[in-house]
Regions:
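N-terminal cationic amphipathic segment used for targeting or macromolecule association
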Residues: 1-2, 161
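Catalytic micro-motifs at enzyme active sites that drive phosphoryl/nucleotidyl and oxygen chemistry
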Residues: 106-111, 143-153
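C-terminal accessory/tail domains of diverse enzymes
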Residues: 2-119, 125-139, 168, 172-178, ...
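Structured core elements
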Residues: 160-162, 271
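Short, conserved phosphate-binding/catalytic loop or strand-edge motifs used
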Residues: 153-160
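Catalytic palm subdomain of template-directed nucleic-acid polymerases
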Residues: 164-166
Length: 333
């Protein structure tokens, strides 16, 4: 028997016609869920990009180091723009050549490398019904000459979403991860990540053995065991859905015991890293990538459908491509 189509009622928050909303919009604590957005691009210096964003969204620019700027009080809240390379940020590194020769050299290098080393625009927590407003920033960057991952053979630029977890319980976290691993081959077919990003391994899939463990409907660990299992299989940030920031937020001591030197920012969010950033493509919008994430959350919220999907995966004899077809039918038919 085929599963009934997913029927998610419209959100009372409204949202935007091109942008779907997840089925769970309020956390276990009763607050509206938010999402952070990060987009990488080249072709503009950090200072130039900050000016572009200020012109489009308002706010006041504050320089935090030669290649990092905050735009305070924009229509999207406080934003950050910086060159995505620690060596060009004297304030972030105690001992490097830039710190020795001064901020003027750091600023010059930031401008000189703007076509090679990407900039990154980062939002703070944004209400999920306002995600569509981020496209205004994308449009402004494109008009100013920003380049996307498709514009250079060595570019590997990503669009990242940091959706707030609906809660701190295993019931708020495991279903989302389970839905994600079961839909991963479908997502990759839809997203078609840039070959350079795949080659450089910025957003690798989860190991096959770990996928089978998480896919099993009988896998129901408590939170501590879940964190231990995750760390044993994934002692790295290099995953297309990075849970280390979330797990660090939930139990920092447990994570640091395994990864004492890993650079991990603690926050109550998933870190979805698979999509490309194609800022320069005419009409490129973050809507399709956001909607694919919402599709994962919708499957996660349907316990019966999720269990059927997991059981089917464990008994599936085919390859990844044919599983993507089967997963799409089971999840969305």
């Amino acid at each position: 028997m085929s599963a009934a189509p997913l029927d998610i009622p419209p959100s009372p928050l409204g949202g935007h016609a091109d942008f779907d909303l997840p089925p769970v919009l309020v956390t276990e604590g009763g607050e509206r869920r938010a999402v952070g957005i990060e987009v990488e691009f080249a072709g503009l210096s950090a200072e130039g990009a900050a000016a572009v964003i200020q012109n489009a969204l308002g706010g006041a620019i504050e320089q935090t180091d030669p290649n990092a700027f905050r735009i305070i009080g924009t229509s999207l809240g406080d934003l950050e723009v910086e060159i995505d390379s620690r060596i060009l940020h004297p304030s972030k590194t105690r001992h490097n050549v830039i710190a020795e020769v001064g901020s003027r050299v750091a600023s010059w290098l930031g401008s000189a490398t703007s076509h090679v080393i990407p900039c990154e625009l980062v939002t703070g927590p944004l209400p999920m019904d306002r995600v569509h407003e981020f496209d205004r920033a994308v449009d402004a960057l494109r008009t100013a000459g920003a380049r996307g991952t498709q514009d250079g053979a060595l570019y590997a630029f990503g669009l990242h979403f940091n959706p707030q977890a609906a809660g701190a319980s295993i019931d708020a976290i495991l279903p989302v991860l389970r839905a994600f691993v079961l839909l991963n081959t479908w997502l990759r077919r839809q997203v078609a990540p840039d070959a350079t990003r795949s080659l450089l391994g910025f957003a690798d899939p989860f190991p096959a053995d770990y996928v089978r463990r998480v896919a099993d409907p009988a896998y129901r660990p408590d939170l501590a065991a879940f964190i231990d299992d995750y760390l044993a299989a994934n002692p790295t940030r290099n995953r297309d859905l990075d849970l280390l920031p979330l797990l660090t937020h939930l139990d920092e001591a447990r994570v640091r015991a395994v990864l004492p030197n890993e650079k991990i920012g603690s926050r109550p969010t998933f870190h979805y890293r698979l999509p490309d950033a194609r800022v320069s493509d005419p009409g490129w919008s973050i809507a399709p990538e956001w909607n694919r994430w919402v599709a994962v959350e919708r499957v996660a919220a349907d316990a019966e459908r999720l269990d059927r999907l997991g059981t089917a995966y464990l008994g599936f004899p085919g390859d990844d491509k044919s599983w993507a077809d089967r997963a799409e039918r089971l999840a969305f038919a």
